[in-house]
Amino acid sequence: MRHAYRGRRFNRTAEHRKAMFANMSAALIKHEQIITTLPKAKDLRPVVEKLITLGRIDSVHTRRLAMAQLRDADMVKKLFTVLGPRYKGRPGGYCRIMKAGFRQGDNAPLAVIEFVDRDVDARGKDSGPSQVADAA
């Protein structure tokens, strides 16, 4: 029986899991919808919902707490200026997880995790390497 065991290890060290969820949280805040495996999506949801709850209260202290977890100043700014006010009146339940079939290579169950009232235009925005103009 697995009583009192919470969360999954994903065959990673604690530091690797922490970094993985920080990166996935930043990606979800940036694009407002990501595709990942179902177990990762299930473990990512409480992490992101706690960040959104922090984003509803804009103070120096909550910004520092969010920065300690996200490690991305632009995503912290979006969390407090866009997402926090958007979910100000909602008492939780900011994310939804929808099953998205199975991955081709290893048949792993996939899921789409997204914000409930997401901005449709945010998906894929500013993704990929930045374009640097050559001054030749």
UniProtKB/Swiss-Prot annotation:
One of its GO terms (cellular component) is cytosolic large ribosomal subunit. Signal peptide: none annotated. The keyword Repressor does not apply. The keyword Zinc does not apply. GO terms for biological process: translation. Keywords: Ribonucleoprotein, Ribosomal protein. GO terms for molecular function: structural constituent of ribosome. It holds the Pfam family Ribosomal_L17. It comes from the Bacteria. Part of the 50S ribosomal subunit. Contacts protein L32. Belongs to the bacterial ribosomal protein bL17 family. This is Large ribosomal subunit protein bL17. It comes from Methylobacterium radiotolerans (strain ATCC 27329 / DSM 1819 / JCM 2831 / NBRC 15690 / NCIMB 10815 / 0-1). The gene is rplQ.
